[in-house]
Amino acid sequence: MEIKSKNDIIDYFASGIKQDELIGVENEQFLFNIKTNKRAEYENIKKLLQIFITKFGWQEIKENDNLIGLKFNGKSISLEPGNQIELSGDKLKNIHEVCVELHNFQKELDSACFDTNLTNMATGYDPVTKLKDAPNNPKERYKIMTNEMPKGGELSLNMMYQTSGTQVNMDYSSEEDFKKKFKLMCYLTPLAIGIFANSAVYENRASGYLSYRAKVWQNTARAGLPKIFLELSLIHI
């Protein structure tokens, strides 16, 4: 998208207005080889994805003839740069439906992991693997990001290869609704980081943070917002 004026930005957000106000959740996890205690390599991941296809009916997603993800009934499975596996959930009405969706996926993932000698770890930061030893996969976008991201943040590669997390996507019904939800989420994010902090360890030693993931994401090229977004003069909640 080429931005030529302020209205281009306004129109982009206006085009996203929805009346149903659904939510969707993206959930990432690390995968480890239980025989080596190391992160799963791409060859391991391909076998895991094949289990989802043959056992649970998922459909493959390929790039340059490489298996890089799956799709099924509004959901998709994709790989992050360090082979973190991500479920991008369907558009749902409430968190109860999200909970059911995630539990169903976890059952399938546990079964596929058992068949491929893998195990999952749902932490914000890989507690044992050094960055130089993190695995990768053949997605073209990640090759570009690996070269470009460090130019804008000293921990950008750590963010790409060593972190996992949960993202919540929410519809908005109007410009006013967007402003209220956006500002509220800006305020709630630090609280969520504190409540769900589970990444105090990295490279087998204490990081000095309860959430080292949060520390890493403050030093990347793609995170953070100007303080103007929190100015009280913008909107009252």
Q: Where would I find each of the regions flagged by the language model?
A:
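Internal, well-ordered domain-core segments that constitute the primary functional module
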Residues: 140-195
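Conserved small/polar residues in nucleotide/adenosyl-binding loops
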Residues: 235-237
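A broadly tuned preference for mixed-charge, low-complexity surface segments
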Residues: 79-85, 134-138, 169-176, 218-229
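Short, conserved secondary-structure transition motifs
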Residues: 127-135, 201-227
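Flexible helix-coil linker/hinge segments at domain or subdomain boundaries
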Residues: 116-122, 190-210
